[in-house]
């Protein structure tokens, strides 16, 4: 890798699941600074302090705390408000008239609203999170001082909000995090802060990109778009999963060779798929390649929104399975459904622009009309 030295890269779906489910692979050496994260970009230091770099049993305790507030049951209850807000965004787009930047006007705004509701962030403060999240994930194009200043703003803001929720609890995730701190002295304020910020960073930036890529995928596949329009409610769930699996290819990016999931280090010699990963060696999963493994997926090169067997690993697997997966899936389903329900004639008006200086390489501009 350009950074952090050599790393084993797993492309086969079954081997990826085997490794991700094996507790002998850990991330502590990256968190402590003993090892540099082997990656295609210089991995942001802040992210190495977050939950995804913790290992059990501490990781398990922290994760359970947040999972209670992002349970499938709670996310299901949030769906109606997501649908309502998606339609408000579409109303605003229609009122302004085409062309529109689908990313700014729709795909980013929807997950920001939903995550802010979950965390209990006041409406007037929500636009700040777009700047803060992009800064956290920036790997070029911004100076270290600019990134540090934005991170400090975010940390100060969230610390203040957590303190408010401890004093005046509400029915939101920050209140639950603050209450947990009061009941459990082993959970520090810094841990609460990093969990909240990780949800902000991962909870809307990635989801916004999934929504954008999903819409673009349907715009580029006439047969799949027509099929989706014929049964939006019936196909929303499987369409969302296919976007998670196949969206990278629809962007014109290679099936393999992406950055992959966050790497692990083997604590002892471990055999995976006939290969021995030696103690101390790093290994990562390329989820795009694993999602196009012909041994796991039939006709993997084809976009099929009716696909039932879809064992993609875009949201990872095992103890590090994406914490916000229920919320991300719901937002992606709603984001795809409502835009095509309201604007069935949606069409692209230019190439998608991608920010290659960001860890997640998000689409920043997708001009559309209807």
Predicted stretch roles:
Residues 1-370:
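Cytochrome P450
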């Amino acid at each position: 890798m350009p950074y952090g030295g050599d790393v084993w890269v797993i492309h086969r779906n079954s081997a990826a699941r085997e490794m991700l489910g094996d507790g002998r692979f850990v991330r502590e050496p990256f968190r402590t600074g003993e090892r540099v994260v082997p990656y295609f970009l210089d991995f942001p230091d802040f992210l190495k302090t977050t939950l995804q770099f913790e290992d059990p049993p501490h990781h398990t305790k922290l994760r359970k705390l947040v999972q209670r507030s992002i349970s499938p049951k709670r996310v299901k209850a949030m769906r109606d408000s997501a649908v309502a807000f998606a339609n408000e965004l579409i109303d605003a787009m229609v009122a302004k008239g085409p062309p529109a930047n689908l990313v700014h006007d729709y795909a980013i705004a929807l997950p920001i609203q939903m995550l802010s509701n979950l965390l209990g962030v006041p409406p007037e403060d929500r636009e700040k999170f777009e700047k803060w999240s992009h800064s956290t994930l920036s790997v070029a194009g911004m100076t270290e001082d600019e990134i540090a200043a934005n991170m400090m703003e975010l940390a100060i803001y969230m610390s203040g909000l957590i303190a408010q929720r401890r004093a005046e609890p509400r029915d939101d995730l920050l209140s639950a995090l603050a209450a947990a701190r009061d009941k459990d002295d082993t959970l520090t304020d810094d841990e609460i802060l990093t969990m909240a910020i990780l949800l902000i960073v991962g909870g809307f930036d990635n989801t916004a990109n999934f929504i954008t890529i999903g819409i673009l995928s349907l715009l580029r596949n006439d047969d799949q778009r027509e099929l989706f329009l014929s049964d939006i409610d019936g196909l929303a769930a499987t369409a969302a999963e296919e976007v998670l699996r196949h969206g990278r290819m629809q962007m014109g990016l290679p099936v393999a060779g992406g950055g992959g999931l966050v790497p692990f280090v083997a604590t002892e010699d471990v055999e995976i798929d006939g290969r021995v990963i030696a103690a101390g060696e790093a290994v990562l999963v390329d989820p795009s390649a694993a999602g196009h493994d012909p041994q796991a997926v039939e006709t993997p090169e084809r976009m099929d929104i009716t696909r039932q067997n879809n064992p993609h690993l875009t949201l990872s697997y095992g103890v590090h399975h994406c914490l916000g997966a229920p919320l991300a899936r719901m937002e992606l389903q709603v984001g795809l459904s409502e835009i095509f329900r309201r604007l069935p004639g949606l069409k692209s008006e230019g190439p998608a622009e991608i920010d290659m200086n960001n860890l997640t390489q998000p689409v920043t501009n997708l001009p559309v009309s209807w």
